[in-house]
Amino acid sequence: MAAAMDVDTPSATNSGASKKRFEVKKWNAVALWAWDIVVDNCAICRNHIMDLCIECQANQASATSEECTVAWGVCNHAFHFHCISRWLKTRQVCPLDNREWEFQKYGH
């Protein structure tokens, strides 16, 4: 994952009196990730796919809030699971291409 870092080691000639150039006292690593998809908004609620759907935003204050996960169809369109579940109660097709909906992946 991470490459090995080059470390300066004192040579034999400077071993006694050499000082370190610097010393790392603290290091706070920061990382960011994102889904590798072309469309990054849920076409149903219009929220960013990485953000909470409107249903989860409304229930955010309650202690029983679930994870807001992403659902992928075989057509490779992604929606919040809550949004597509609510959509599928009335129509069994993808909201974007009108093909019959079938789950390909579900979750993070």
Swiss-Prot record:
Stretches annotated zinc finger (RING-type): 53-98
**Entry binding sites for Zn(2+) 2:** C53, C56, C68, H82
- InterPro entries recorded: RING-box_E3_Ubiquitin_Ligase (IPR051031), Znf_RING (IPR001841), Znf_RING/FYVE/PHD (IPR013083), Znf_RING_H2 (IPR024766)
Named from the GO MF annotations, one term is: zinc ion binding
Q: Locate the residues binding Zn(2+) 3.
A: C75, H77, C94, D97
Q: What does the record give as the function of this protein? A: E3 ubiquitin ligase component of multiple cullin-RING-based E3 ubiquitin-protein ligase (CRLs) complexes which mediate the ubiquitination and subsequent proteasomal degradation of target proteins, including proteins involved in cell cycle progression, signal transduction, transcription and transcription-coupled nucleotide excision repair. CRLs complexes and ARIH1 collaborate in tandem to mediate ubiquitination of target proteins, ARIH1 mediating addition of the first ubiquitin on CRLs targets.
Q: Which family does it belong to?
A: Belongs to the RING-box family.
Q: Give the quaternary structure.
A: Part of SCF complexes, which consist of skp1, cul1, rbx1 and a F-box protein. Interacts with ube2m.
Q: In which tissues is it expressed?
A: Expressed in heart and kidney.
According to UniProt, the reaction catalysed is:
S-ubiquitinyl-[E2 ubiquitin-conjugating enzyme]-L-cysteine + [acceptor protein]-L-lysine = [E2 ubiquitin-conjugating enzyme]-L-cysteine + N(6)-ubiquitinyl-[acceptor protein]-L-lysine; S-[NEDD8-protein]-yl-[E2 NEDD8-conjugating enzyme]-L-cysteine + [cullin]-L-lysine = [E2 NEDD8-conjugating enzyme]-L-cysteine + N(6)-[NEDD8-protein]-yl-[cullin]-L-lysine
Identification of the protein by name: E3 ubiquitin-protein ligase RBX1
